[in-house]
């Protein structure tokens, strides 16, 4: 809000106050003139007439009191009222990182000065042992009234104190003088005019006119008019008008209008419009819109859209799309792309060579799918072939230049396939001769 807006609001409030005062004055005049014509006794039926239900002479008394269309106009419908409340880019800037944020909050050397360390602060507050022990007149008249030297008798003392008389007589200004206070001063227990235990006019324990424990007119513990613990008019602990602990008008702990702990309108702990602890609109601890702890839109702890701890879209702990712990799409424990090991359960070998063996890596297509055995001669032949093939595979793996898919060229791969085929045929012939 600009300065012009504040000036306009102040002028409007001033006009309303002046108008209400004028109306109140007119009402008092009318009421006083009406009271002169009526009897004000309790038993008179005309006593309450016109008090709250204005007589038939003025049926318009309550008209427009709360139904005035201009009364609520502009209260919340002003297009400038909400402007900049949540869309200010500087909204969360400097919430807790500002070195000046907490400066002077509770470390002001003058803040606690004289609160409880003043040697005169507690003097005469709750103990007055010397006077109680030595002065026999200390408690005289404190809790009981002595009727000595009173013109009225004891039975007549309370007559007319709290009940109106039937004659409607007007009370004198001095009627209550000295009724419940000491003869010397109007104070009840204290040493000043209106203090109860303190030394000032209206203070209960403090030293000022309206303070309870503090030194100012309206402060309870503080030094300002309306502050409870702080030094400003309306602040409770802080230094501003409406802040509770902070320095701004409406902030509770912060410096801005509506923030509870921060400096902006609606943020609680963070620096953005709707974030709780983070810096973005919807993030709780992170910096993005929907992330809880991370920096991306939907991630909980990570930096990507759907990852919980990782950096990719769907990974839980890893960095790839579908991997759980690794970096590949569908691998369970490893990190390979599984294009090399299409569907292997425990190993990394190319199971296109073994064609779905359950426990081993052998070519069970030759063993005719026996569950526990390998039927007849086919089973023995398959076992021998598997044993020989295992040896051949070991020899191939011990080759100083093993087969690789990415280093060797196409010609080298063809050459190795031919050599491997020849070795297998020779081993089959030798096995047939022995059988």
Curated annotation (Swiss-Prot):
Residues making up the propeptide: 23-193, 199-201, 207-209, 215-217, 223-225, 231-233, 239-241, 247-249, 255-257, 263-265, 271-273, 279-281, 287-289, 295-297, 303-305, 311-313, 319-321, 327-329, 335-342, 348-355, 361-368, 374-435
Pfam families reported in the protein's UniProt record: FARP
Compositional bias of kind Basic and acidic residues: 230-371, 398-435
Subcellular localization(s) per the UniProt record: Secreted
Positions of post-translational Pyrrolidone carboxylic acid modification: 194
Disulfide linkage: none
Protein family (similarity comment): Belongs to the FARP (FMRFamide related peptide) family.
Listed name of the protein: Antho-RFamide neuropeptides type 1
Species of provenance: Anthopleura elegantissima
């Amino acid at each position: 809000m600009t300065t012009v807006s504040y000036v306009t609001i102040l002028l409007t409030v001033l006009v309303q106050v002046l108008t209400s005062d004028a109306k109140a004055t007119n009402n008092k005049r009318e009421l006083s003139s009406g009271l002169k014509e009526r009897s004000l006794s309790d038993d008179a039926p005309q006593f309450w007439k016109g008090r709250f239900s204005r007589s038939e002479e003025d049926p318009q008394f309550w008209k427009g009191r709360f139904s005035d269309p201009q009364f609520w106009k502009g209260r919340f419908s002003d297009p400038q009222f909400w402007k900049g409340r949540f869309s200010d880019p500087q909204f969360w800037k400097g919430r807790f990182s500002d070195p000046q944020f907490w400066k002077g909050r509770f470390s002001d050397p003058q803040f606690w000065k004289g609160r409880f360390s003043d040697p005169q602060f507690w003097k005469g507050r709750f103990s007055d042992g010397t006077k109680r022990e030595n002065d026999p007149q200390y408690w005289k008249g404190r809790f009981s009234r002595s009727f000595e030297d009173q013109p009225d008798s004891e039975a007549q003392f309370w007559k007319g104190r709290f009940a109106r008389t039937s004659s409607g007589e007007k009370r004198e200004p001095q009627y209550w003088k000295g009724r419940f206070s000491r003869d010397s001063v109007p104070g009840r227990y204290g040493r000043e005019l209106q203090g109860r235990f303190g030394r000032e006019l209206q203070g209960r324990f403090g030293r000022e006119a309206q303070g309870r424990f503090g030194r100012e007119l309206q402060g309870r513990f503080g030094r300002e008019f309306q502050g409870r613990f702080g030094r400003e008019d309306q602040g409770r602990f802080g230094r501003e008008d409406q802040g509770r602990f902070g320095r701004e008008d409406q902030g509770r702990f912060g410096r801005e209008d509506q923030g509870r702990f921060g400096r902006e309108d609606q943020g609680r702990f963070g620096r953005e419009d709707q974030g709780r602890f983070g810096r973005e609109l919807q993030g709780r601890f992170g910096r993005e819109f929907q992330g809880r702890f991370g920096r991306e839109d939907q991630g909980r702890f990570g930096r990507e859209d759907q990852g919980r701890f990782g950096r990719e879209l769907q990974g839980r702990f890893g960095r790839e799309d579908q991997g759980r712990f690794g970096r590949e799409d569908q691998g369970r424990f490893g990190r390979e792309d599984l294009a090399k090991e299409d569907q292997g359960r425990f190993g990394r070998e190319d199971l296109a060579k073994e064609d779905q063996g359950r426990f081993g890596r052998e070519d069970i297509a030759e063993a005719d799918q026996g569950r526990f055995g390998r039927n007849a001669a086919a089973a023995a032949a398959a076992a021998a072939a598997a044993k020989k093939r295992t040896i051949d595979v070991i020899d191939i793996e011990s080759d100083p230049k093993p087969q690789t898919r990415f280093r060797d060229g196409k010609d080298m791969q063809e050459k190795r396939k031919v050599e491997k085929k020849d070795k297998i045929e020779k081993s089959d012939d030798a096995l047939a001769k022995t059988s």
